[in-house]
Curated annotation (Swiss-Prot):
GO terms for biological process: translation. Gene3D superfamilies: Nucleic acid-binding proteins (2.40.50.140). Coiled coil: none annotated. Keywords: Mitochondrion, Ribonucleoprotein, Ribosomal protein. The gene is RPS12. Belongs to the universal ribosomal protein uS12 family. This is Small ribosomal subunit protein uS12m.
Amino acid sequence: MPTFKQLLKKPRKIVLTKSKSIALIQCPQKKGICMKVYTTSPKKPNSAERKVAKVNLTNGKSIIGYISGEGHTLQEHSLVLVRGGRVKDLPGVQYHFVRGVYDLHAVGTRKKSRSKYGKKLFKAPIV
């Protein structure tokens, strides 16, 4: 353990943590325009067709994001809201799209975990 004099001579270094979602530039979300919507296959033990899209953000950066949930309404030139969060079995996909905002509609048939997929609460009419 250093003495007080040693700390005065050479203070402790502050360890800076690097952001994992660098394209957002310290913002929680960013708006973007879809350039290409396509499917890709995941890494080795998994097998599927994952829906992804290449997006140009409003700050000029280009990213690849994951479209979560079943079915989507994205086309070229659609507006999307991008948040951080990588997809473990898709290399290079470090971002998710927020469902239920702009042109990416909510998952319509969702009953559980609705907040993650932009689905409003359905209340049956009182008779």
